[in-house]
A protein has these predicted regions:
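Short S/T/G/P-rich N-terminal loop/turn motif that feeds into the first structured element of a domain
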Residues: 1-68, 86-92
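Outer-membrane beta-barrel domain signature
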Residues: 70-79, 83-84
Length: 92
């Protein structure tokens, strides 16, 4: 399984983020989730919001990453104006 996850430095505007989430749900071969970060073990969390896609395997991730839908999500995320960090993980 492969996950692509995004950590946002601040919480995006809810209505604007729902528009973004609609784009994210269109990425083929993936399950999309998102939510507000509410805490950390010690002190305030560094990130305020997260999103993730889950793909069955590396081939599914690579295929999805080449789609117009996936590319549109990156462009749209940048247009929201909230700083974010993208990471990829292979889950055993």
């Amino acid at each position: 399984m492969v996950r692509a996850f995004v950590l946002y430095e601040s919480e995006p505007d809810a209505a604007r983020y729902e528009q973004h989430a609609e784009l994210c749900r269109k990425v083929p071969g993936s399950t999309f989730r998102h939510g507000r970060v509410f805490g950390a073990p010690m002190g305030e969390p560094k990130f305020k919001y997260y999103a993730e896609w889950e793909f069955a395997d590396m081939d599914a991730f690579k295929a999805a990453a080449r789609t117009d839908e996936f590319m549109a999500t990156g462009k749209d995320a940048m247009e929201m104006g909230v700083p974010f960090h993208v990471h990829f993980a292979q889950v055993d």
